[in-house]
């Protein structure tokens, strides 16, 4: 189980990403449309002024059950340990143990 502080920090980052997503996307589009270097620098500075944790790549994918940050399966939102347990218990529809 991950530390509660790390899980909460990641939740806070997720909220910031959602809050600033529209503004960040608008600024990025404005940056693409800017023609002069001065305009691009001004828009870039506005992007830099946004909170650091509002960038989507600062988020970390974590298991929804344990909060484990590694060996995360995106299709399920679970780490490998929980995925294995739940698959054995039949809690994941359509997931079967492979056999060849």
Swiss-Prot record:
InterPro entries the UniProt entry points to: Ribosomal_uS14 (IPR001209), Ribosomal_uS14_bac/plastid (IPR023036), Ribosomal_uS14_CS (IPR018271)
Single annotated GO MF: rRNA binding
Keywords: Ribonucleoprotein, Ribosomal protein, RNA-binding, rRNA-binding
Record GO biological process: translation
Cellular component annotations (GO), alphabetically ordered: cytoplasm; small ribosomal subunit
Subunit details: Part of the 30S ribosomal subunit. Contacts proteins S3 and S10.
Stated family: Belongs to the universal ribosomal protein uS14 family.
HAMAP family: Ribosomal_uS14_1 (MF_00537)
PANTHER family membership: 30S RIBOSOMAL PROTEIN S14, SMALL RIBOSOMAL SUBUNIT PROTEIN US14M
Record's function text: Binds 16S rRNA, required for the assembly of 30S particles and may also be responsible for determining the conformation of the 16S rRNA at the A site.
The protein, known as: Small ribosomal subunit protein uS14
Classification lineage: Bacteria, Bacillati, Cyanobacteriota, Cyanophyceae, Synechococcales
């Amino acid at each position: 189980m991950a530390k509660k502080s790390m899980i909460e920090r990641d939740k806070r980052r997720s909220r910031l990403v959602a809050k600033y997503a529209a503004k960040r996307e608008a600024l990025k589009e404005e940056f693409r449309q800017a023609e002069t270097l001065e305009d691009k620098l001004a828009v870039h500075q506005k992007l830099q002024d946004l909170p650091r944790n509002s960038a989507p790549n600062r988020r970390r994918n974590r298991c929804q059950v344990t909060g484990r940050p590694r060996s995360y399966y995106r299709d399920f939102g679970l780490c490998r340990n929980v995925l294995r347990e739940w698959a054995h218990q039949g809690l994941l529809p359509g997931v079967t143990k492979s056999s060849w």
